[in-house]
UniProtKB/Swiss-Prot annotation:
Official protein name in the record: Uncharacterized RNA methyltransferase bll2648
Domain of life: Bacteria
Species the sequence originates in: Bradyrhizobium diazoefficiens (strain JCM 10833 / BCRC 13528 / IAM 13628 / NBRC 14792 / USDA 110)
Gene Ontology molecular function: 4 iron, 4 sulfur cluster binding; metal ion binding; rRNA (uridine-C5-)-methyltransferase activity
EC number from the UniProt entry: 2.1.1.-
Length: 415
């Protein structure tokens, strides 16, 4: 059923929000102040509508730069001018903190998209008539939109989509694929690092075919479910003055500019601390840079990432880095273990670090620097620190996921 709505504002998920009859209606790709024609969405989404036409457009509306926008589900916001978009992203942080009763300075949004995303996951699926499609998930669907170029990717990933198509063809033609095929491609110093997931065991002829593709596309490394198929060169990335060899599938900040921005903000807030603890350290984007001036102790549950950090820590000129695997959700560091550190940095995954935040709140650590990719769980954890006696010295929102609702942030707490 077609209806006409007036959009009040853009919500935290990037959808236009129409208010009326006591409920909110969400319309993707609509902007505040617009009058739009919409249709109901099939399925269990009574509060969502499909945008059919914009009758009265916002003066802030701009033309999307990608021909796949609105069909591909990768980007939610290419239709909004930069200035109001930046203000909206900052407002997500301000409003979420306010809901948690946190009143602090929130700096202007820092754009850290840089030259684009350095990692991408492509999906391989069979469509109608058993035709293979490789690309991104469609908006609000598990369908695959076949794509050969994505303008938000780092130019170093220019060959990623062609390589994914070339790998998907032998994987799907020479053996049955019982699960969706996912192909993660990461840009590294020595070429593309590719991990394939969803395929079954690889018979020798298929390994040969995949190795041929890897050579043709000059992949640095090809793995299947993290197991090595072929490596031409070590897939390394630069972190500070150090080259780190990435374990297959290990966490990596989305953009080079994003990592450098977050690391710089962390270092500024750590200040002159001599003993620093890095929690949820990953492969060491913060630890390796902090070790240029301070001794660092680092923990993460990913043993492969910790091993990569330990190897990189041997780089000449760094102060000692002691690192070991530890599940910080099940075994958070307790106040007695925290007492010798001048500063603690923690950068948990999206679920936040509630258990560790409780222990930090009971500690005497002078400075805590929080990095987060989820404003809601950050607000929860920040509330715990504040209730434990810490003051929050301000928040800096960082946008390395441009054209999406996702926003990262860095905050400093002190006693």
């Amino acid at each position: 059923m077609v209806e006409r709505l007036r959009i009040d504002h853009v919500g935290h998920r990037g959808d236009g929000v129409a208010l009326g009859a006591g409920e909110a209606i969400y319309v993707p790709y609509a902007l505040g102040g617009e009058t739009v024609e919409v249709d109901h969405v099939a399925g269990n989404h009574p509060d969502r509508r499909k945008l059919l036409a914009v009758d009265v457009a916002s003066p802030e509306r701009v033309a999307p730069f990608c021909p796949h926008f609105g069909i591909c589900g990768g980007c939610a916001i290419q239709h909004w001018a930069a200035e109001p978009y930046h203000a909206w992203k900052r407002s997500i942080v301000v409003e979420t903190l306010a809901q948690a009763g946190i009143d602090c300075e929130v700096a202007p949004l820092v754009d850290a998209h840089g030259v684009g995303r350095r990692r991408v996951t492509l999906h391989g699926r069979f469509g109608t008539h058993d035709i293979l499609k490789v690309g991104f998930s469609a908006a609000s669907s598990h369908d695959v939109i076949p794509i050969h170029r994505c303008p938000i990717l780092d130019p170093a990933l220019d060959g990623a989509l062609d390589a994914a198509w070339a790998l998907a063809e032998p994987l799907t033609s020479k053996m049955p694929v019982t699960k969706p095929l996912d192909i993660q491609v990461t840009a590294t110093t020595n070429g593309l690092d590719v991990d394939v997931r969803g395929s079954g065991p690889l018979p020798t002829p298929l390994v040969t075919a995949l190795s041929r593709v890897a050579e043709q596309h000059r992949l640095a490394r090809l793995t299947r479910h993290g197991e090595l198929v072929l490596q031409r060169l070590p897939p390394t990335v630069k972190m500070g003055r150090t080259e780190v060899t990435l374990p297959p599938g290990s966490f990596l900040q989305a953009t080079v500019a994003g990592e450098e921005t977050l690391a710089s903000l962390v270092a500024e807030r750590v200040g002159k601390a001599k003993e620093v603890l890095d929690l949820f350290c990953g492969v060491g984007p913060f630890a390796l840079r902090l070790a240029e001036k301070a001794r660092v102790t680092a923990y993460d549950s990913d043993a492969g990432a910790v091993a990569a950090l330990a190897k990189a820590a041997r780089t000449p000129g760094l102060k000692p880095i002691r690192c070991e695997p530890r599940d910080l959700f099940r075994r958070p560091l307790v106040p007695q273990e925290l007492r010798d550190f001048d500063a603690v940095v923690f950068d948990p995954p999206r679920q936040g670090a509630q258990a560790q935040a409780l222990k930090l709140a009971a500690s005497t650590v002078p400075v805590i620097v929080a990095v987060s990719c989820n404003v809601a769980t950050f607000a929860r954890d920040a509330r715990l620190l504040i209730d434990g006696g810490y003051r929050i010295d301000g928040v800096v929102p960082v946008d390395q996921f441009r054209h999406t609702p996702h926003v990262e942030l860095v905050a400093r707490f002190a006693r």
